[in-house]
Amino acid sequence: QRSADGVSRGSPEPALRGWEAFGYGGPELAREDPKGAALAAEKFDTFLAALRGDGMATAAPFEQQYPQMFHSGAQLPVLPHSPGADRRIWWGAGTHASAELAARKGVNLMSSTLVFETDGASLGDVQAEQIARYRREWEKVGHDWEPRVSVSRPIFPIVDGSDAQIFGPAGSGESHDSIGVLDDQRGIFGRTLVDTPDKIVEALKKDKAVMAADTLMLTIPNQAGVAAGARILENFARYVAPELGWEPATKG
């Protein structure tokens, strides 16, 4: 019950068709699906089917089995099966269409700090629209459970001089989102918030996507080390999150 796994097609990588190193694809796929998008979708469907307990293989004739456990020709699921495991899967959506697809597949939604939708709106506004589309599609499909939706933000609360020394002085983050090209697509990149807790709270309350989501993920720069990451989390939990309505689990 404590596992939560995020999945997506993935961002560009240094390797050329890296999936081929693991036995997937070939010359035909390289021509028809050079970025591996269709391959990723196919494998994700297989992954979900396995999690949901669908038959993934056919039982051998009974006399050939060891140990002899299944009727010949029976459909075999992945065992042990954990009911509900598929409800703890999150799909990372980079477009509105991908978010709607996640709803149809019945998985939670992650929207990160980059979205390939550039209509002049801010990242928060674009993601709020993405979330709305996801929820409308979810309701239309008629799933019998309530999904979760997350957005990610790089946030560095500056509480004292040591924070400023590590992460930069208050107000030194970008003042606005930016437009760039990644994987041959134009996308909007979210700004980094480096500021005092009150300014961060003010900015997040104006962020329509943060307000629409039920989960806010912090992007922690792991290259800064464990201590720096822990400091970011502590400052956010102590000075920012309570102002957004969050209560620690220690309160029961």
Regions found by a protein language model. Give the residues of each.
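Active-site-adjacent structural elements that line small-molecule/cofactor binding pockets in enzymes
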Residues: 1-252
